[in-house]
Amino acid sequence: MANNFRTDRVGMEIKREVNEILQKKVRDPRVQGVTITDVQMLGDLSMAKVYYTIMSNLASDNQKAQTGLEKATGTIKRELGHNLKMYKIPDLTFVKDESIEYGNKIDQMLRDLEKK
């Protein structure tokens, strides 16, 4: 139980820090409009899966954002090392969060059902 609490707490802290780093430190225009929605940590805190959304729905913008985040991983890890009191900063993997689009799709289906 305590280990799960720790991974959740570290994940929330990484989420907050990565959002701040993307806004203030990363100058790559490909990551403009990217918001971190969730961070899932491995139990031993060695890896973090970082879920993000982007304002644009265009596939090309999604691919550019993914590429920009992958290129900025070193900068993000370095800044996390300065800001977090951890022995080892976890490896970061960026994954597009599809849950918001899925939720919007379900909302639209419900609205369509109401109209009938």
Curated annotation (Swiss-Prot):
GO molecular function: ribosomal small subunit binding
Annotated compartments: Cytoplasm
Gene3D superfamilies linked to this entry: 3.30.300.20
Cysteines joined through disulfide linkages: none
Main subcellular location of this protein, as a coarse class: cytoplasm
Record key words, sorted: Cytoplasm, Ribosome biogenesis
Pfam families hit by this protein: RBFA (PF02033)
PANTHER family registered for this protein in UniProt: RIBOSOME-BINDING FACTOR A, CHLOROPLASTIC-RELATED
Entry function: One of several proteins that assist in the late maturation steps of the functional core of the 30S ribosomal subunit. Associates with free 30S ribosomal subunits (but not with 30S subunits that are part of 70S ribosomes or polysomes). Required for efficient processing of 16S rRNA. May interact with the 5'-terminal helix region of 16S rRNA.
Protein family (similarity comment): Belongs to the RbfA family.
Protein name: Ribosome-binding factor A
Gene name in the database record: rbfA
